[in-house]
């Protein structure tokens, strides 16, 4: 190892070792860029000095409500300034941030509240009904509700709860942030769908988030003062860590509450947006925008897209409009994207067909990832880099989660062999680029959001006419994938597609509902296991 013979007196100390945390970025930005725009939302424009003060008041206000170090503070918010502030203000008081998908149903939100033991929740006025319904289903104590109204969007405070402004007003602007004493301390708790049907709590540490911000800035070739549009939900992998990254560069976070083609074009033309991330559905939205929604702009907009390989036709249509698109890949367990389909100039002369095929590959490790490769999950051997032999994508590095909260068995399984097992099946090309060929564990990725097929199956199996059910992904031009339910009815049963979809609608969030129902005898193995790979073939041809 790299130790010299005599290292007496060369120990770590307060002068030469400081725990890495993305909180440092905003503290520095408040000093270095105090007058630069930090956050923009319609008529709201916050300088870095103001942004830092508001985050400080949030941290102090939470402490005044009894929030202690290590407590979980949840959010159910759209992409608005309060959500960006929560990314700094919550951990600045030592608490752990739990951003919750706003599209979930009450039962799942209740489970997340209970499992994470949320002490408080910052909730958009439009989502108060969801939170109250979830609290009714909880087993444990309810979180403190802090209502976040949005008068700019037409949603004033209900008057029934403490408001976000009340919380900030009670905070001390002179409060000293509680910076982590150990960079392994928990920063965020994010829930991800799994094949068990219940979401798993992914715990992220300060070190990983800090390194994500550094590596992303390098991969995106960012210079100072980028203008970043929040299309990726701030609840999704903490906005891929981009909100934590922007203060490092003195950049501007431009909040987008409602994602529409018109809103995107307006932000680019009026606010000079230089970067954004989004699923391929966002690219399709831009390409297929109505003429009335389109705006002219004279600069290149850099885009990270993830969730599915961008279709060649979409790339061919969007690039001439002024967008430079790179596919990235990652998971909640890896803080977001950890691979990039890095472009090489030698490919510029390739045919369009070849270029788009190259751009559809999953890519190579980003700078903050130690190793990402395709391996045989049985013996952890590297698969041949022949673009044909399939293996599982394995990931190792400092931007891999601490583990699954309160689930040591799942954590041990995920880290077996010294790598994180992604569950995604891929080949590896001779130039080391990985390319996903299939999704393992039956997760359906629709519009960038994960759907547990087991959860959907569990709901449909409650219908009195259903004997067996299997849910698989059906390719979809708009969403990438949508749930397709393959159902075997009980003898004499007469339920039809409309009835089953309506039944599912009563119990599932909109994006989880089956968009197609097929009635057939389900293929099974000799032991009675449903052969989903056969059903995927059927769904693919629909």
Q: Can you describe what each PLM-predicted range is?
A:
Residues 34, 146-147, 156-165, 169-191, ...:
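Conserved pre-ATP/AMP-binding loop-to-beta segment of ANL
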Residues 75, 104, 121-123, 276, ...:
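AMP-binding/adenylate-forming catalytic core of the ANL superfamily
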Residues 210-227, 235-275, 288-289:
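Conserved AMP-binding/adenylation subdomain of ANL enzymes
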Residues 64-65, 92-169, 491-493, 506:
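Structural core segment of the AMP-binding/adenylate-forming
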Residues 365-367, 371-394, 430-431, 493-497, ...:
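Conserved beta-loop-beta connector loops within the AMP-binding
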Residues 165, 248, 273-278, 287-357, ...:
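Gly/Ser/Thr-rich phosphate-binding loop
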Residues 52-60, 169-174, 188, 202-224, ...:
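Conserved structural elements of the adenylate-forming
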Residues 14, 18, 35-80, 84-88, ...:
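Conserved AMP-binding/adenylate-forming core of the ANL superfamily
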